[in-house]
């Protein structure tokens, strides 16, 4: 099977942004108060208008991904246990969202932070929509998928981002690039891998101990987890 080629995935822009999720990214505890809700609603309109969601994906066998250096670390291997192949996925909201976040923050720090939270929520919505499309594709093939697993989870290093981007040809197909520090640009972008199997698989669910946000997580400070919200 080897790797690729990458293919575009059609994404429809949602009618709205998940404000509850954005409030959590914003740091609202126990739900947004009236002022926070109003701020998020106000900032959501121009941010959604600025979004141009795009996604690309490919299928590859695990041996080829390993040989390419993409499956570095033990945790991603655990996630792919029982799988015969994997899908690579990249999703981006486009440069307009980054620009809108910067505009919103000029002279209004709260609006900038709110817009950033909204962008994160919208990126997750786009990734969920892309994953749903891939699950439909897998079902037509009689296949099953694990959940998404992204660089930075567990010991899967961010250093694989350039390899993922190159395999998916994200610069040409989606305008998505990787900086010298292995960060994605546009910033509101997500890359991930999903295992493919002939039987139902769950994948390795990274708990709090593996989360890249564990040292600054607001949920952990409150003695709960994001999964419980």
Segments from the language model and where they lie:
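Short cysteine/histidine-rich metal-coordination sites, predominantly Zn2+-binding motifs
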Residues: 224-229
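Conserved mixed alpha/beta catalytic, RNA-binding, or beta-rich assembly cores of soluble enzyme
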Residues: 83-147
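Generic secondary-structure signature for well-ordered alpha-helical cores
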Residues: 45-52, 135, 139, 169, ...
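Short terminal or interdomain "cap/linker" segment that borders an active site or interface and mediates
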Residues: 141-219
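Conserved active-site and cofactor/substrate-binding residues in soluble primary-metabolism enzymes
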Residues: 35-38, 42, 121, 125, ...
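Short conserved micro-motifs at the rims of enzyme active sites and ligand-binding pockets
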Residues: 101-102, 221-223
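Active-site helix-to-loop segments that bind/position phosphate- or nucleotide-bearing substrates
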Residues: 1-112
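Metal/cofactor-centered catalytic core regions of large enzymes
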Residues: 34, 74-78, 210, 215-216, ...
């Amino acid at each position: 099977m080897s790797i690729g080629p990458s293919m575009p995935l059609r994404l429809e822009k949602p009618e709205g942004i998940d404000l509850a999720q954005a409030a959590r990214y914003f740091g609202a505890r126990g739900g947004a108060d009236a002022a926070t809700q109003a701020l998020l609603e106000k900032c959501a309109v121009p941010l959604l208008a600025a979004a141009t969601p795009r996604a690309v994906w490919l299928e590859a066998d695990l041996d080829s991904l390993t040989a390419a250096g993409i499956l570095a670390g033990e945790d991603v291997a655990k996630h792919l246990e029982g799988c015969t192949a994997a899908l690579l996925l990249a999703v981006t909201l486009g440069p307009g969202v980054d620009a809108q976040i910067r505009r919103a923050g000029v002279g209004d720090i709260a609006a900038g932070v709110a817009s950033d939270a909204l962008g994160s929520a919208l990126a997750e919505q786009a990734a969920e929509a892309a994953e749903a499309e891939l699950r439909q594709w897998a079902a037509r093939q009689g296949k099953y998928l694990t959940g998404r697993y992204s660089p930075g989870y567990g010991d899967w290093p961010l250093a694989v981002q350039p390899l993922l981007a190159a395999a998916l040809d994200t610069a040409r197909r989606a305008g998505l690039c990787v900086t010298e520090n292995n960060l994605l640009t546009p910033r509101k972008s997500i890359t991930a891998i999903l295992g493919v199997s002939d039987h139902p698989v769950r994948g390795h669910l990274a708990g709090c101990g593996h989360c890249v946000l564990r040292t600054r997580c607001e949920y952990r400070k409150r003695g709960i987890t994001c999964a419980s919200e």
